[in-house]
Amino acid sequence: MNASTETSIALPDINDIMRNLPHRYPMLLIDRVVAFSKRERLVGIKNVTINEPYFAGHFPQKPVMPGVLILESMAQACGMLAFKSEQEELGGNHIIYLVAIDKARFKRPVEPGDQLRLEASLKRVMRGLWMFQAQAWVGDALAAEAEIRCTVKEA
């Protein structure tokens, strides 16, 4: 699906992402949103460059994005899906907390120059717990996938 078939509202830009997520450099791991369907799915982009601070030590001779940061980027896409889906109800005084990651699998390394396509799909919301299926893709290759659970709380 392309962005125009998924939503009739303007897609979040980096300023909107920064209004909704509390993360800042070097932990803001989503650069833009390219598709959004309220309470269904969000597709975000993370451009991976050699200038990322973690590449200095992971690993100097063969830089690879740490798996935990791939998971964090997927969790941020899930957070954006939750916030954009409920922005009228939540207002601006809430923060999303990661509760659990299950069934995390890493399929290929993510290297400098790669563009991560972060796909977050909402499975259900139950008693304040948001449950997502998330994937990170590089081109047509699945890099990682996980089930992610979050909760939204007042800041």
From Swiss-Prot:
Top-tier EC class: lyase
- Reaction catalysis annotation: a (3R)-hydroxyacyl-[ACP] = a (2E)-enoyl-[ACP] + H2O
Q: In which domain of life is the source organism classified?
A: Bacteria
- Location of this chain's protein in the cell: Cytoplasm
Q: Which cellular component terms (GO) are annotated to the entry?
A: cytoplasm; membrane
For this protein, the record's InterPro entries field holds: FabA_FabZ, FabZ, HotDog_dom_sf
**EC number(s) on record?**
4.2.1.59
Coiled coil region boundaries: none
A GO biological process held by the record? fatty acid biosynthetic process
Gene Ontology MF terms in the entry: (3R)-hydroxyacyl-[acyl-carrier-protein] dehydratase activity
- Protein role: Involved in unsaturated fatty acids biosynthesis. Catalyzes the dehydration of short chain beta-hydroxyacyl-ACPs and long chain saturated and unsaturated beta-hydroxyacyl-ACPs.
Q: What is this protein called?
A: 3-hydroxyacyl-[acyl-carrier-protein] dehydratase FabZ
UniProt gene name: fabZ
